[in-house]
UniProtKB/Swiss-Prot annotation:
GO cellular component: cell outer membrane; transporter complex
Keywords: Cell outer membrane, Membrane, Signal
Gene source species: Legionella pneumophila (strain Paris)
Signal peptide: 1-21
Transmembrane segments: none
Any one GO biological process: Gram-negative-bacterium-type cell outer membrane assembly
Gene of this entry: lptD
Family annotation (InterPro entries): LipoPS_assembly_LptD, LptD, LptD_C, OstA-like_N
Subunit text: Component of the lipopolysaccharide transport and assembly complex. Interacts with LptE and LptA.
Protein name stated in the entry: LPS-assembly protein LptD
Source lineage: Bacteria, Pseudomonadati, Pseudomonadota, Gammaproteobacteria, Legionellales
């Protein structure tokens, strides 16, 4: 029996779970049904933009528009099915027909069409399938599909659509717009997974042809947030540029297993290179990236990174291995006659790097930092960070720290791998500490407001075997015991303070030296007191400048230090050295670093500091400090070591100051913030003993926006430039070095980045890179060329490592990169936010 029902009557009928409501749809559903095999034209793209809800907006500078949000008001019951239509022909046992402005809603799923057919199970009379035809629009949260035909299965909420134009929202951190595309067929499974046949996929705006994936099929796993494209082509401006049988990409912020975009690039030391990274999301808190890497000049390298995060630990393991390096083999063959020390080196190149931090308990922590490379040239040949090419000391350290309310205990093992490239200035190895045991106590609640601080430390120093300099293999080594109790009584008032302090330094050494004829031993014990008196005053006044109210402070400070002289030249130098003199050194109790040299002192430091503080916020606008030390006696303790007990430090040693002049250099420091975007800092130290500048630095930082940055810096250090000269000798000269770096937008989408470091003393550049970056709505590109000083050649002319970095980021899909220059940019452009940085 056929029943023709008008919209008014339809609203009153409720039959077998189908609730019909007569809500006339005033706005027709905009359909964009075009067969999948039809190529896109500009007119079709314009039509698609309307169908997908695209709103052009020139005030949106990046994407030039936005999508209307997809909103669906859910029904009260998720199992309820509601159907609206202008007319219906209903059959109890046959197919029912709905016509005119048909709308079906089940939960948060809505389907619109001009015609619908309802199918029932002949036995149970339940609706098993609803078929929609003509101008079909399929909506659910974050999903829109416009199709020629759709079939919905209400019982398990699955369905499929044909000749589809779709829009799927993504939750990717770098995707600004939802994904959209076309497919000949889309299946929606009961678990909300999707299968797309003969499909395209892009996150560009509908009228933007920048990139798209065209695949035989695309599977989208909703729970895992992963998409897999099979037999896929990457099209750039509709031109096919890459084919891959398998491509995995994320559809949300979660990490996904799968192949990443290929790595491409070029360098003068490795040649052209190609890598195919595979990312393995092993668990929510474990992952691994494997990268087979082909270098045309060297061979095939296998690299990988393993990361983990547990309730107690976090860490990263990096490793690379390249067997039988062709270029390195030629290098060894060409140089082994002149440099016999490289004879027999393996051509297998490798690197391991392990960093771990484990919190066993709230007060017990383990830290590990280990790095090792196969040979002295590995970083020069393979480092992708221009700042690391000239690194010569690789740290290997593990420490276990236990902390209580008043004490800190630490056990540590530490050593370094020292790299010795040929025809470069030799670098001395660093003593190993195997182990170091430390205990530090601090009590600040003693009678008379006194503070007691005590440090006890045991170090077992071991000189590493160094085949490059046999003469150094009889270096002193052995244990050192250090004890340093300090008692101070700070007396604080709002207008100033006075802090008398007394302390003792106790060092004990058990020294051995290995010779060809045997081992020599010696013991040394040293007990030295230190007395100091520190005092300062606080003055302040109100200041009104250019419409802003400030508080200006004036803070004079005096610091008297008395340390008696003890001859220490018999004692080896394990970790002591001269320090660069600046404002911070005015109030130190020891002019040497480390514990092996306790400088004698009878001196008075005097300094003056002034600050400008904004009255409302308390933010510091500016500060300036200047000070000097008046010596009442000559400084007799020398850094040098001699078995005779007598030696004199070389006056040209870096950081060494006159030991006879009556005053120290004048140290000054200034910090000024012109506004929140513009600031300047600088140190200037003038030495009256030489009537010349001892050291200076000036740094400028301008950042009016997140990635609009200009940095400039200049450094000058007396004897800070060690130069290799003929006959393998070296000489110390003043270091003049300048650096300029910038990241600056050239337009809404284009920006430039670059840095340049120049050694004025030697008249050549140390590092430089320059690049341009394009950042649009759905993709970004960066090309960066750079070079860094590597070494001097036989004519003492600079040699460089040259690299070209190419990065292409397809937002919502992945990136193509020759390597990751994020380390370079973060090092040389402070404050820079890298949109390509992996997160």
């Amino acid at each position: 029996m056929a029943i023709g029902i008008t919209a008014c009557v339809l609203s009153l009928i409720n039959y077998q779970g189908l609730a019909y409501s007569a809500a006339l749809i005033n706005e027709p559903i905009q359909a964009c049904v075009i067969a999948r095999e039809v190529d896109l034209t500009d007119d079709i793209r314009t039509k698609f933009a309307q169908c997908l809800g695209w709103q052009a907006d020139q005030s949106s500078p990046v994407c030039l528009g936005f999508y209307k949000p997809i909103t669906v008001t859910p029904l009260a019951s998720p199992d309820e099915v509601r159907i609206l239509a202008d007319t219906a022909s209903f059959y109890r046992t046959q197919r029912s027909t709905l016509s005119g402005h048909v709308e079906m809603q089940q939960g948060q799923r809505v389907v619109n069409a001009q015609t619908a057919y309802v199918y029932r199970d002949p036995k149970t009379n339940e609706v098993t399938k609803i078929e929609f035809l003509n101008h079909v629009r399929y909506l659910e949260p974050d999903r829109m599909m416009i199709a020629r035909k759709a079939v919905v299965y209400p019982q398990d909420k699955s369905g499929e659509v044909e000749d589809v134009l779709y829009r799927f929202n993504t939750n990717r951190s770098n995707a600004l717009l939802p994904a959209w595309g076309r497919a000949s067929l889309i299946k929606r499974f009961a678990n909300q997974d999707y299968f797309l046949k003969e499909a395209t996929y892009t996150t560009c705006a509908p009228q933007d042809k920048a990139w798209a994936i065209e695949a035989e099929s695309i599977s989208i796993d909703n729970e895992k947030g992963k998409g897999i494209a099979r037999n896929a082509k990457l099209r750039i401006h509709e031109w096919p540029v890459l084919y891959t049988p398998y491509l995995s990409f994320p559809t949300n912020r979660d990490r996904k297993s799968g192949f990443l975009m290929p790595i491409v690039g070029y360098s003068n030391v490795g040649g052209a290179d190609l890598g195919i990274p595979y990312y393995w999301n092993m668990a929510p808190n474990y992952d691994m990236t494997l990268v087979p890497h082909l270098y045309t000049k060297r061979g095939l390298m296998l690299g990988g990174q393993f990361r983990y995060l547990t309730s107690k630990s976090t860490g990263t393991f990096n490793g690379n291995f390249l067997p039988k390096d062709k270029a390195f083999g030629r290098f060894l063959q060409d140089n082994e006659v002149e440099f016999p020390q490289i004879r027999g080196l393996s051509t297998n190149r490798w690197e391991v790097n392990f960093v771990d931090s484990t919190q066993f308990l709230s007060d017990l922590q383990l830290n590990v930092n280990f790095q090792q490379v196969s040979d002295d040239y590995y970083l020069q040949d393979f480092s992708t960070n221009l700042a690391s090419v000239t690194q010569r000391q690789l740290l290997r350290q593990a420490d276990l720290t236990y902390t209580t309310e008043n004490w800190t205990f630490r056990g540590m093992g530490q050593s370094y791998q020292t790299l010795h490239p040929i025809n470069e200035i030799p670098v001395s190895p660093v003593y190993e500490r195997l182990p170091q045991l430390m205990a530090r106590g601090y009590y600040d609640d003693l009678p008379f407001n006194a503070n007691f601080n005590i440090l006890g430390q045991y170090d077992q120093f071991h000189w590493p075997n160094d085949s490059w300099n046999i003469a150094l293999n009889n270096m002193p080594q052995g244990p050192r015991f250090h004890l340093n109790p300090i008692l101070s009584v700070p007396m604080m008032k709002p207008w100033g303070y006075v802090t008398p302090s007394v302390q003792f330094v106790e060092n004990y050494y058990d020294i051995s030296r290995n010779y060809t004829w045997g081992t020599s031993r010696a013991n040394y014990n040293l007990t030295i007191p230190r007395y100091s008196l520190d005092g300062g005053l606080y003055f302040e006044r109100d200041l009104h400048l250019k419409g802003t109210y400030y508080i200006q402070t004036l803070e004079p400070r005096l610091f008297y230090l008395r340390v008696p002289y003890y001859n220490q030249t018999l004692i080896p130098v394990y970790d002591s050295g001269f320090m660069i003199f600046n404002v911070d050194q005015l109030f130190r109790t020891n002019r040497f670093s480390g514990f092996d040299r306790i400088g004698d002192a009878n001196q008075l430091s005097y300094a003056l500091t002034t600050r400008w503080l904004e009255d409302e916020s308390g933010a510091e606008k500016a500060n300036f400090s200047i000070g000097q030390i008046k010596y009442f006696s000559e400084r007799r303790v020398q850094l040098c070591q001699s078995p005779t007990g007598f030696c004199t430090d070389n006056p040209d040693t870096f950081g060494n100051l006159s030991s006879t002049f009556g005053t120290s250099p004048v140290a000054s420091r200034a910090v000024y913030k012109f506004n929140p975007a513009w600031g300047i800092t600088g140190d200037y130290i003038w030495d009256p003993a030489t009537r010349a500048t001892n050291n200076a630095d000036l740094n400028l930082h301008y950042q009016p926006a997140r990635n609009a940055i200009i940095n400039g810096g200049y450094s000058y250090l007396v004897n800070g430039d060690v130069t290799q000269v003929r006959n393998n000798d070296t000489e110390n000269n003043a270091l003049h070095q300048a650096i300029l770096s910038a990241a600056w937008p050239l337009s809404e989408k284009w920006s430039g980045i670059g840095a340049y470091s120049y050694n004025i003393s030697k008249n050549y550049s140390m590092m430089s890179f320059l690049g341009v970056q394009y950042d649009s709505c759905c993709w970004a590109m960066r090309i960066l060329g750079g070079r860094t000083f590597r070494s001097l050649n036989e004519e003492f002319e600079p040699r460089y490592n040259n690299n070209i970095y190419l990065q292409i980021l397809l937002k919502g899909l992945g990136s193509v990169a020759s390597s990751d220059p994020s380390g370079i940019l973060n090092t040389y452009i402070p404050g820079y936010y890298d949109p390509f940085r992996r997160r």
